[in-house]
């Protein structure tokens, strides 16, 4: 799964990752090294013929849900996303890209402790995770726009930490992923198979465990000898 991530790169850096990224008129969120569920994050959507950046809340609330409860999924499985009522409509017409510099997973050690790890590109560059978004007019007095992150079975180094990982879309698949006219299940599912899995994994301090902690310290590499993994 993906239950925490970070985004500190400027939008100008993400414009090198997402083709045709439009950030004009956007009041960008400040960098966040510890984005947690229910918090706001930056996503890219296809709107008025362009790829536009917006701030949405993490935890999907479908537009048809008139009385949103506590169940606000932060992840959706790529394998079954087209079948679940919670995600089905968004899967066809409301897909997005979640701006990210890295995400965190917790690995259970032999001593019972859970050690947090940071996962990101090997060269340290930013990337985008495949997501879904929704606009719900019933969730609050002014409505609420939300998103979730799509996950897939983990591979490579990521699989040594957790059995799931976010779908990281390469540039070649992004335009079609954002295009609502691409709505056939087979077409969209095919895009999810193109995930980029070249990730670097390293341990970080348990400082990241608390969502209240939000500084660069969350993503600093911790020496393996300090994790108690051996």
Regions found by a protein language model. Give the residues of each.
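Short linear sequence motif anchored by a di-proline
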Residues: 1-230
């Amino acid at each position: 799964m993906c239950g925490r991530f970070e985004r500190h790169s400027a939008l100008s850096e993400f414009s090198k990752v997402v083709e045709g990224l439009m950030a004009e008129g956007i009041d960008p969120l400040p960098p966040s090294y510890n984005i947690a569920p229910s918090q706001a994050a930056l996503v890219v959507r296809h709107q008025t013929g362009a790829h536009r950046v917006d701030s949405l809340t993490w935890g999907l609330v479908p537009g048809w849900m008139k009385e949103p409860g506590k169940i606000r999924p932060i992840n959706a499985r790529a394998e079954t996303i087209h079948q679940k009522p919670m995600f089905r409509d968004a899967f066809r017409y409301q897909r997005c890209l979640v701006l990210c510099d890295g995400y965190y997973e917790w690995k259970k050690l032999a001593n019972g402790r859970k050690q947090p790890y940071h996962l990101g590109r090997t060269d340290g560059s930013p990337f985008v995770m495949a997501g879904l978004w929704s606009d719900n007019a019933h969730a609050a007095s002014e409505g609420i726009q939300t998103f979730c992150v799509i996950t897939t079975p983990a591979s490579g180094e990521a699989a040594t930490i957790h059995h799931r990982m976010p779908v990281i879309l390469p540039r070649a698949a992004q335009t079609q992923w954002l295009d609502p006219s691409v709505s056939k299940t087979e077409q969209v599912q095919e895009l999810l198979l193109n995930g980029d899995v070249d990730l670097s994994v390293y341990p970080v301090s348990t400082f990241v465990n608390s969502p209240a902690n939000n500084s660069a310290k969350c993503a600093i590499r911790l020496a393996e000898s300090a994790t108690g993994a051996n």
